[in-house]
Amino acid sequence: MNRNIETFRIDWNGISIEIRWEPRWLGMDIGYNTAHIEIESIAPERAHLPITETGYRSHFTSPDTVAAYGGPVAFVEAWLETESQAPDWRRAEQQRRQLSLF
């Protein structure tokens, strides 16, 4: 079984992120095309992102969905931007940036 995993790096709000994209997950065609995308913050290592508190996210989707965004990088950037508008993320981000004296 030949696997085709593409790797991309982006910078999002000062966080370096690695995107690993496998358009045909495990090379399987089982009547539904399954793609796999992994998102990991690498600098700072495992930094929180709006789509994951651990800095890592594994996501299965359709390759057509990702293609509709213009590819894996555009898909992840759109996902991050959308989720970064959520009130919980904005509050948490503000708290992380706030200096603490204790």
Please state what every model-predicted region is.
Residues R3-A35:
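Amphipathic, interaction-prone secondary-structure segments
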Residues E38-F102:
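Acidic, low-complexity intrinsically disordered segments
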